[in-house]
């Protein structure tokens, strides 16, 4: 659970979930609240000829679609921090429909231990909430070495759907690796890559996003939105859907996390038979099949 006051996050506290963690929450998770209120990008921006100016969402997405249409070999960096619905939207619209090369970087830091509801210790070096969601969608998961080579060896425009998808992306080296290419980044805070990007989009935080996530144990859980998006920020699923419309792969229709989840459950075997309504009222549902436990 997320405690907030006057639109600012104050603390994280554990939600009682007898099937997953009981009342317990790790200290690492508790202290993620620090810095959660940082917001340096709240409107779409366009940079050209040394100038930065505010643009509309329509204008920003049309620019990105144009980058992908007129230049060969566009690259896309997705994120294991995104919801299942966002990752499904990426797979269907950017990989399957547009034929883009997409990777999902996973940061394997120090091994962390967390006790589950049955008193068993779970060890993992995966610092992301939804690496398994990416794998289940069939999106390629890469480590930092492959992420670096993916960006350095590419020569097409780049779309980064989470400026903090991997710690390396927040470094000056990452910005230098793509300095000669058109780049668009979805972000909340400034990094060297964000500050040099051709287009910057304000992304909603996960506390401002509704959706589902697949744990390292293969349990799909629903997360409610705690706060409204700040400024003009939008969640990743909404950004990808809107971009797909500009690329001609989606028609104007009502879309929401619930709608996307239903379509995902119909098309992705691991989620078959699940419903959004049940996930909103139950502590979680196991996927069909095995999960890749990172450790």
Each language-model region and where it sits:
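Broad hydrophobic/π-residue packing in well-ordered secondary structure
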Residues: 24, 31-35, 53-57, 77, ...
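Short, surface-exposed, charge-dense and proline/glycine-enriched linear segments
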Residues: 3-6, 105-111, 215-220, 281-294
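Long, low-complexity segments enriched in small/aliphatic residues
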Residues: 259-295
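Non-catalytic alpha/beta scaffold blocks inside enzyme catalytic domains
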Residues: 90-93, 97-273
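N-terminal export/assembly segments and adjacent metallocofactor-ligating motifs
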Residues: 1-145, 154-155, 159, 163-164, ...
């Amino acid at each position: 659970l997320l405690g907030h006051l006057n639109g600012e996050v104050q603390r994280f506290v554990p939600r009682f979930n007898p099937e997953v963690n009981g009342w317990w929450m790790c200290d690492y998770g508790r202290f993620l609240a620090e810095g959660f209120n940082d917001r340096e990008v709240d409107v779409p921006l366009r940079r050209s000829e040394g100038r930065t100016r505010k643009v509309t969402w329509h204008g920003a997405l049309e620019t990105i679609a144009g980058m992908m249409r007129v230049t060969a070999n566009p690259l896309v960096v997705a994120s294991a921090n995104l919801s299942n619905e966002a990752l499904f939207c990426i797979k269907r619209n950017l990989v399957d429909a547009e034929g883009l090369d997409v990777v999902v970087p996973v940061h394997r830091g120090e091994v962390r231990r967390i006790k589950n509801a049955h008193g068993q210790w779970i060890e993992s070096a995966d610092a992301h909430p939804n690496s398994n969601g990416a794998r289940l969608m069939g999106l390629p998961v890469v480590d930092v070495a492959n992420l670096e080579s993916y960006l350095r060896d590419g020569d097409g425009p780049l779309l980064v759907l989470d400026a903090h998808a991997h710690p390396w992306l927040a470094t000056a080296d990452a910005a230098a690796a793509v300095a000669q290419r058109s780049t668009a980044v979805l972000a909340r805070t400034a990094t060297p890559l964000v500050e040099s990007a051709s287009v910057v989009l304000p992304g909603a935080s996960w506390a401002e996003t509704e959706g589902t996530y697949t744990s390292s144990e293969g349990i799909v859980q629903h997360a409610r939105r705690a706060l409204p998006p700040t400024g003009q920020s939008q969640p990743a699923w909404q950004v990808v859907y809107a971009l797909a419309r500009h690329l001609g792969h989606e028609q104007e229709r009502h879309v929401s996390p619930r709608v996307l989840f239903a379509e995902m459950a119909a098309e992705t075997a691991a989620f078959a038979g699940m419903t959004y309504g049940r996930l909103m009222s139950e502590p979680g549902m196991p996927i069909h099949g095995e999960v890749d436990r990172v450790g």
